[in-house]
Amino acid sequence: MPDIVNRKVEHVEIAAFENVDGLSSSTFLNDVILVHQGFPGISFSEINTKTKFFRKEISVPIMVTGMTGGRNELGRINKIIAEVTEKFGIPMGVGSQRVAIEKAEARESFAIVRKVAPTIPIIANLGMPQLVKGYGLKEFQDAIQMIEADAIAVHLNPAQEVFQPEGEPEYQIYALEKLRDISKELSVPIIVKESGNGISMETAKLLYSYGIKNFDTSGQGGTNWIAIEMIRDIRRGNWKAESAKNFLNWGVPTAASIMEVRYSVPDSFLVGSGGIRSGLDAAKAIALGADIAGMALPVLKSAIEGKESLEQFFRKIIFELKAAMMLTGSKDVNALKKTSIVILGKLKEWAEYRGINLSTYDKVRKRE
């Protein structure tokens, strides 16, 4: 087995310090316009950003999606993120826990999260390929118990695996059969998330047919994991690097993925993530059809700078979200989900080509 721990460190180093954010790709969120209301009918002070994350109430409709863990220095990053998200009442996901299941010394870098964040929702994380490789109920329960998780994310990352030097692109259909059986035995919900390339309506429908109702888009336009693996390939002189260059804009853009999942699985719980870089992006994702927005890379970068930097980042994000709510007359998150929007440009073209009737979709996104 390759050294997963060193790979985790290299992933964080490349993500934080190389140019991989939105490289050669777009979220399409620029094509979502929130309609300004000159007389909002509310005051800024009465805006309520609280919402539900499964069984728990959260302060803001934003979560930190999983990214890291596995070594002491990564545990320190997780600790900072956990302390700050606890302070702000924001859910936190951890990175893949495979390393902690297979290497006991890696467990503390994940377990620290619950120790410093006793009340917020914490989301465990395992990869779909591990189901093919033999993971089952025992490993899922271990990942959940390790951090006393409120949910577990199962990540899809076929594009990353294809271009990873030591990748394991194993996605046989029986993995979904195993996942369906495991979900029936777990005490917490499963969220299926992508890893920077988005969830299409075909994938959403397939997952739904196996009992999955919770999704995290992780769409194109944010952290480019193909680019991260391309850089790792280049460092190793791996011939895959040249091929990876041709796939840097591969995937379903975040805004399109939100629409595709909401349209095809209207009753889903949906996290809109992938290139969410501001509170305005978060507001657009929610107005477009997500229940909450998710972000990882900007949180990671701020956490590396320190606790104060991350606190300031969240204050900025929350202010921008509330500003968007104020200027659309949305006094709470449910109102934001129903606020008037205009869909333009490439996103409109994408939706129309994919058979999404915009008038019908407007009712679907408002949950009417």
Curated annotation (Swiss-Prot):
UniProt main location, coarse: cytoplasm
Top EC class of this enzyme: isomerase
GO CC field: cytoplasm
Annotated residues for binding of FMN: T65, G66, M67, T68, S96, N125, K193, S218, T223, G275, I276, R277, A296, L297
Isomerase is among the record's keywords: yes
UniProt keyword list: Cytoplasm, Flavoprotein, FMN, Isomerase, Isoprene biosynthesis, Magnesium, Metal-binding, NADP
Region forming the signal peptide: none
Annotated Gene3D superfamilies: Aldolase class I
Binding site for substrate: R7, K8, S96, Q97, R98, Q160
Coiled coil ranges: none
Gene Ontology process terms (BP): isoprenoid biosynthetic process
Task of the protein: Involved in the biosynthesis of isoprenoids. Catalyzes the 1,3-allylic rearrangement of the homoallylic substrate isopentenyl (IPP) to its allylic isomer, dimethylallyl diphosphate (DMAPP).
Protein name in the entry: Isopentenyl-diphosphate delta-isomerase
Organism: Saccharolobus islandicus (strain M.16.27) (Sulfolobus islandicus)
Upper taxonomic lineage: Archaea, Thermoproteota, Thermoprotei, Sulfolobales, Sulfolobaceae
